[in-house]
Amino acid sequence: MMPINLNLIMAFSLALIGALVYRSHLMSTLLCLEGMMLSLFIQMALLISHFHMFSMSMAPLILLVFSACEAGLGLALLVKTSSNYGNDYVQNLNLLQC
C-alpha cells in the first residue's frame, strides 16, 4: 500500500474517532465531518487519476459539492441552536427531549 493511501486512511479514521469521541459539541462534530469528507475527496481523486478512470472524473467534484452543502447546513444549524440555547451542545437538537 502506498504511504499516501495509508495517510489518508489514517486521517479518515482519526476524523471518525474524533466525531465519535467529541460528539457533545456540534462545532467539533462538524469539523470532524469536514476532515472525513476532505480525506475522501483526496482519496477519490488519487484513485481516479491512478487508474486512469477519466469517465469518473466528476465524482470527486460532486462529493465536494455535497460536502459544501453539508457544511452550509451544519453551520446554519449551529447558528440557530447557539442563538436559541446559548451553546452548541448536540443534546439540544433532540426533539424528543422535554
Curated annotation (Swiss-Prot):
It is an enzyme of class 7 (translocase). This is NADH-ubiquinone oxidoreductase chain 4L. It catalyses: a ubiquinone + NADH + 5 H(+)(in) = a ubiquinol + NAD(+) + 4 H(+)(out). It is a multi-pass membrane protein. It is found in: Mitochondrion inner membrane. It comes from Distoechurus pennatus (Feather-tailed possum). Core subunit of respiratory chain NADH dehydrogenase (Complex I) which is composed of 45 different subunits. Pfam families: Oxidored_q2. The chain crosses the membrane at residues 1-21, 28-48, 59-79. It comes from the Eukaryota. Belongs to the complex I subunit 4L family. One of its GO terms (biological process) is ATP synthesis coupled electron transport. Keywords: Electron transport, Membrane, Mitochondrion, Mitochondrion inner membrane, NAD, Respiratory chain, Translocase, Transmembrane, Transmembrane helix, Transport, Ubiquinone. Core subunit of the mitochondrial membrane respiratory chain NADH dehydrogenase (Complex I) which catalyzes electron transfer from NADH through the respiratory chain, using ubiquinone as an electron acceptor. Part of the enzyme membrane arm which is embedded in the lipid bilayer and involved in proton translocation. The keyword Manganese does not apply. One of its GO terms (cellular component) is respiratory chain complex I. Its main location: mitochondrion. GO terms for molecular function: NADH dehydrogenase (ubiquinone) activity. Its EC number is 7.1.1.2. The keyword Electron transport applies.
